[in-house]
Amino acid sequence: DVRELGADFLAFSAHKALGRMGIGVLWGRHELLDAMPPMLTGGEMIDSVTEQDATWASVPEKFEAGTQDAAGIYATGAALTYLTRTVGYDAVAARESALVPYLMGRMAELDFIDVIGPADASAHHGVVSFNVRGVHPHDVASILDASGVCIRAGHHCAQPLLTWLGVENL
């Protein structure tokens, strides 16, 4: 319950839960959303408009510019249903808890791989960031992709963190 958490906002990216890229959810306290101007403009978000002024629709409509991605919304619901009812979060956590130590152990055997973060596998929570010395991360991703292994490479929308870590890409 986000109200119990005391959160002002909660953002969710569907692709991080088996959903499609480019769709997500934003929950926010009504009074904060009401005070915010929309970032984008489009149909269905205007209550009234003149040549000089526009009055935004009420929350949430004032943030929903243009045509909604109906297929993406449906796909997100299906992905979440599959993840929660068929697979289950506990099963995902158990699988990650088994795979991460295995992966980190195998990587530790290779002197050309630098794992970013703590040596304790349980601190990685299902994500292992690494670099292969002398090879650009996008090349590593392409090579692994050819073997059926899917990873993400790049700056992961976290360039300040990468600068702090002393790396350009992962």
Q: What spans do the regions from the language model cover?
A:
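Pyridoxal 5′-phosphate
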Residues: 1-170
